[in-house]
Amino acid sequence: MGNHRSDLKATRRWVVKVGSALLTANGRGLDTGCIQELASHIARLRNKGYTIVLVSSGSVAAGMERLGWRRRPRALYELQAAAAVGQMGLIQAYESEFQHHNQHTAQILLTHEDLANRSRYLNARSTLRTLLRLGVVPIVNENDTVATEEIRFGDNDTLSALVANLVEAELLVILTDQEGLFDADPRHYPNASFISEAAANKTELDGMANSRAGALGRGGMITKIRAARRAARSGAITVIASGKEPKILQRIASGETVGTLLWPDRQPLAARKQWLAGQLQTKGRLWLDTGAVKVVREAGRSLLPIGVLACEGNFARGEVVSCLDSDAREIACGLVNYNAEETRRILGHSSHQIEQILGYVDEEELIHRDNLVLL
């Protein structure tokens, strides 16, 4: 299994995610003391040679305070307005604190569309890597002002994992208001067992996360487990720990047994396949027969039309589609070589029949293995 805590000592490129529960004072407004301490600890690590990207929530809560709202609004446009107002205060607070340590910050606001589009994804990656090379602390948040409910990341746990993929971080630290992961919610089940370490893809974690007692903080246990799995695709270790613990970042860096460590238990994906695996929404779905599931999953081969039973959605050539088994479990996703209408016509047929059916043939494969990633 290896000494994963000891491995933390060698990490130098981090993504640190901090949630609203830590940053807000009693759920409203920003906790300036927390921001001050967080900036101080990050600055100290950076002075020791660490490069750190900070993914920070808190804009809506900060905006509510500035607008004098006592209750969190339900309407999306009001939440977006609060986020727009609050993001100013959030960045001002971070900039002020980091300036005390003679360190510059940069604001990066991302949407799902920024990372779903390959060109914009590469641009975001280049910008983040350039900022790190220049010694700047990038502060990342979801661009709530323009994101719609249908295409949101949904939580900054997910965003932080995708950022970890972008910058090829060695470690993702998720700071929450709990000490780590439990097999049940310790606030309701006092006898819940603490999980110190586990493989990120350990199947038993799914059962814990899907149980009613599986909540952790506001994002929930399931989002943190999924984030660890996403981060693991680029080889990153994830530590989920309490941001209320003193000097928590320094203690993690020293290899101390704090929080829950989830280590990557699969080979890292190539950069292009990391992008594919990071797609939160797909344009369509393909149902595969048993034989196709086996060759895709076990042999790593391309998906041929003959192995597809059904097709759902309205997608164009080159868009991302999901591949499902007979139980509707998503096993893979990839860039499809034919549009939805063409796919419906050729599914279930051999590749040599494509030209006879369509009158032309672009590719023999419905999804080439180079554009297909297992999930």
From Swiss-Prot:
Zinc-finger in keyword set: no
SMART domains hit by this protein: PUA
Top-level division of the source organism's lineage: Bacteria
Residues noted as binding substrate in the record, renumbered to the chain: S57, D144, N156
The keyword NADP belongs to this UniProt entry's keyword annotation: no
Ranges of residues in domain PUA: 283-361
Keywords: Amino-acid biosynthesis, ATP-binding, Cytoplasm, Kinase, Nucleotide-binding, Proline biosynthesis, Transferase
Cellular component terms (Gene Ontology): cytosol
PROSITE patterns in the record: GLUTAMATE_5_KINASE (PS00902), PUA (PS50890)
Binding residues for ATP: K17, T176, D177
Subcellular location: Cytoplasm
GO molecular function: ATP binding; glutamate 5-kinase activity; RNA binding
The enzyme's E.C. designation: 2.7.2.11
InterPro entries: AceGlu_kinase-like_sf, Asp/Glu/Uridylate_kinase, G5K_ProB, Glu/AcGlu_kinase, Glu_5kinase, Glu_5kinase/COase_Synthase, Glutamate_5-kinase_CS, PUA
GO biological process, one term: L-proline biosynthetic process
Pathway entry: Amino-acid biosynthesis; L-proline biosynthesis; L-glutamate 5-semialdehyde from L-glutamate: step 1/2
Catalytic activity, reaction form: L-glutamate + ATP = L-glutamyl 5-phosphate + ADP
Annotated family: Belongs to the glutamate 5-kinase family.
Function in brief: Catalyzes the transfer of a phosphate group to glutamate to form L-glutamate 5-phosphate.
Protein name, entry field: Glutamate 5-kinase
Annotated source species: Nitrosococcus oceani (strain ATCC 19707 / BCRC 17464 / JCM 30415 / NCIMB 11848 / C-107)
